[in-house]
Amino acid sequence: MSKDKLWGGRFTQPTDAFVEEFTASIQFDKRLYHQDIRGSIAHARMLGKQGIIPQADVEAIVEGLQQILLQIEEGSFDFSISLEDIHMNIESRLSARIGEAGKRLHTGRSRNDQVALDIRLYLRDEIVEITSYIDLLIDALLTQAEENVDVVMPGFTHLQTAQPILFAHHMLAYVEMFKRDSGRMEDCLKRVNVLPLGAGALAGTTFPIDRDYVAEQLGFPAITRNSLDSVSDRDFALEFISASSILMMHLSRLSEELILWSTSQFKFIELSDGFCTGSSIMPQKKNPDVPELVRGKTGRVYGNLMALLTVMKSLPLAYNKDMQEDKEPLFDTIDTVKGSLKVFSDMIREMSIYPEAMGRAAGQGFSTATDVADYLVRKGVAFRDAHEAVGKAVAYCVENEMELTDLTLTEWELFSPRFEQDIFEAITVDACIDARNVPGGTAREQVKGEIARCRKGK
């Protein structure tokens, strides 16, 4: 049994040693040390400003906390499981260092609003960093688009050849996805960036604190408006993991395409050696481990979202010990997203493109069939009739092992008398691409304009 029990005045028995270890969170919440100290310094200064504790105590507290911060960053601070969490590890060391003044730090504050503050401070910084990583990935995608703006490739639906597009257009599709991810992170930040400190355990405090002062000190534009909600709320963490799940889904989709494109069957791209591994038995192998692992880690983030949703789903107000389980899913999501984004932006930047293979594939699989139908529509044929005629032409080509470009005018006329000599110009891959000159389309003019617009941050 543990000899000393935290806040043990009400108890007659010490905490069981295994229970002490089981309930401790210091193993994972110690990463909040910087935010905990920063929040405590702001709280102490507010207590002094309001005359709640002597100014001399404030100075001792601030100096003591700064020394503890230095110790932690130097690696000389010994974290104790018996002190349960980062809050008590720091407060206990502070009291041991400066004496009675350290015991006054927690005046007007509960661990409930303290931990809510720490998590918000931590997540706020991480969202800013994650958004910067998204920007780097967008830049890498735009660079590939710029450098390969004339490269054509097949576009797919159902993973079957559909219509020819520009490779740059495909890259821009992911730019749009990641721009939305960035927007979701920025929107989430608005709800993270609210000060909960001052809510106390659940009902506020009897001391004349100044929450707005603390908010200003810590860079929060607003304070929470209900003490119960302040300590019960983990919506902001759920929202972040939800946004992260969508972000990882986009990375997973791109991963899947890079894996396919790098196969010998496609050979559209090649990933740099630094992002691939070999085989323990097959000497020829170059395995795309990085996109495969990111694809796998996507499920991990989904699991974190489900874990935290399940923790929160039946909790009565206000704080419950269940909520200690919020940190590991949150921290793991942050680490996974940051790592995935960082490795992806570098991998995309170093990726090699094979225009010849893409170009050959773009003209195969009857990719210009839609344009043949559109050609007939311009000649006065109803679209459904045009669709039927071109379908028959495709069937003819399949039966005779031909492509549409192999047909003679006489053969075209078998399917519609409206076909003329200009059909041959209308169904080249380049003509089909440039014909889609509408906003959002794959025409070169549109794609180049979109790249320029993205570069301007629009």
UniProtKB/Swiss-Prot annotation:
Which GO cellular component term is one of those annotated?
cytosol
Note the NCBIfam families from the entry: argH
Question: Enzyme class, one word?
Answer: lyase
Provenance organism: Pelobacter propionicus (strain DSM 2379 / NBRC 103807 / OttBd1)
Q: Which UniProt keywords apply?
A: Amino-acid biosynthesis, Arginine biosynthesis, Cytoplasm, Lyase
GO MF terms, alphabetically ordered: argininosuccinate lyase activity
Q: Give the classification, highest ranks.
A: Bacteria, Pseudomonadati, Thermodesulfobacteriota, Desulfuromonadia, Desulfuromonadales
User: Has keyword Membrane?
Assistant: no
What name appears for this protein in its UniProt entry?
A: Argininosuccinate lyase
Pfam assignment, any one: Lyase_1
Q: Which domain of life is it from?
A: Bacteria
Q: Which HAMAP family match?
A: Arg_succ_lyase (MF_00006)
The entry sums up its family as follows:
Belongs to the lyase 1 family. Argininosuccinate lyase subfamily.
